From Swiss-Prot:
One of its GO terms (cellular component) is extracellular region. The keyword Secreted applies. Keywords: Amphibian defense peptide, Bradykinin receptor impairing toxin, G-protein coupled receptor impairing toxin, Secreted, Toxin, Vasoactive, Vasoconstrictor. This is Bradykinin-related peptide Pnor-5. It comes from Pithecopus nordestinus. Expressed by the skin glands.
Length: 8
């Protein structure tokens, strides 16, 4: 998932 590094 490309957005796996985005903050949550």
């Amino acid at each position: 998932r490309p957005l796996s590094w985005l903050p949550k």
